[in-house]
Amino acid sequence: LTATDGSTVEFYDEIKAQGGVKDVYFSVDKTYVVAFYRKAINANDKARINDIVNIHRNRIFTSDAVGQYWTAFFAWPTKIVEWKGLTGIVIPFYDKKFFFDGIDPSWPFIKNGQEKNGKWFSSAKLINKFVPVNQKGTFLSRLHMCLKIARAMRRLHAAGLAHSDLSYNNVLVDPLSGNACIIDCDGLVVPHKFPPEVVGTPGFIAPEVLATKALKVDDPKKNLPQI
């Protein structure tokens, strides 16, 4: 396929993973994935994606050392494609450190190749029960991991963006190296331009948003995720 920027995108015509609204295909060289929205998206969503892929990506990930520093913090969409009447986005393949490796085959809870999403490491109880000793990292490495999550969100907010669906599943972590990566960045909120599509995930919802959760989306009294 030819992306909107004129570059070539190659992938296998086989769905490898599915999310809530997208089907994911692997590229031929496995350096990126192509995620197609299962249903046709409206003009507002197309404009949002275009701004995220072009305007905001170029502002955050500049060519200097500072811009390149942030590339490890986000799985940011890099291109837009159209195929069979559907819109898709090209996303860099997650770094291998964000997949479990070295798990004993007899371990019942986690298997090699699973994503290291934040849920596994969100409490001492979960870590001690489900995570093998060789995957836990140290207190210091987990502290570095948490600092990088906070740093990534602060950078988003500094760019005038907000992640409306932050959750355990949308943060990949690696307590061994102390790294973290924010994913699902194609639905970011742009204040006064692109409103949030979801209220958020329980446990991650701001108090003022939770207080008006029962109200309809178009109710002027409803608080939605924003900066």
Label the model's feature ranges.
Residues A72-S141, F194:
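Conserved structural core of kinase catalytic domains
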Residues P195-D218:
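Conserved activation segment of eukaryotic-like protein kinases, specifically the C-terminal portion
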